[in-house]
Amino acid sequence: MSLSSTLTQGIDALGLSLSDDQQRLLLAYVDLLVKWNQAYNLTAIRDPQEMVTRHLLDSLAVLAYLEEGDTLDVGTGAGIPGVILAVARPQQAFVLLDSNGKKTRFVRQARRELGLDNVEVVHGRVEQYRKAPSQIICRAFASLSDMLALMTPIMTDNTRLLAMKAASTEEELATLPAQWQGRHHTLTVPGLDEPRTLVVVNKA
């Protein structure tokens, strides 16, 4: 199956509506990622078909839970999920933060080539970031408690944290400090026969 067909069928299965131009931009991002990945090792996934499933569709699966408002992608890496969500939500502002200069250089190039005026790329650590966003999204890089400890300084009473995790998080939710409340949502990613969970946390 072509990359375009895999993407289109996946978008339909997720119940989303993305224009031909948006889908073209997403495939252009995959092309760019494949090209840069040969020299810079941005992702362990090498196969473009897998990139469509594990990067594009995996990121788009959270779109239904993404509210309006400025969004900070912490540890964006090669721009996942931030670039993908920014293509899907062109009217929404995204800040993509990562401490790896090699990866932020790639994301800046992707921003230019894809014409993503709604994206700002920041090279730095979340501990030094000071602007409180409406919501924070990330592919989980630590336990929920550890992530919250890092992000508490930029979370207001209304800020939501959306953590994309591979496995069930019920035990982690049960051990959250009292000032936090969380819900987990099981995600189905078309073409991926692996568990995916989105945890949404905010102040109680």
Curated annotation (Swiss-Prot):
Molecular functions (GO terms): rRNA (guanine-N7-)-methyltransferase activity
Positions contributing to S-adenosyl-L-methionine binding: 75, 126-127, 139
S-S bonds: none
Signal sequence coordinates: none
Family annotation (InterPro entries): rRNA_ssu_MeTfrase_G, SAM-dependent_MTases_sf
Cross-referenced SUPFAM superfamilies: S-adenosyl-L-methionine-dependent methyltransferases
GO CC terms of this entry: cytosol
Location of the protein in the cell: Cytoplasm
Protein family: Belongs to the methyltransferase superfamily. RNA methyltransferase RsmG family.
Official protein name in the record: Ribosomal RNA small subunit methyltransferase G
Origin species: Alcanivorax borkumensis (strain ATCC 700651 / DSM 11573 / NCIMB 13689 / SK2)
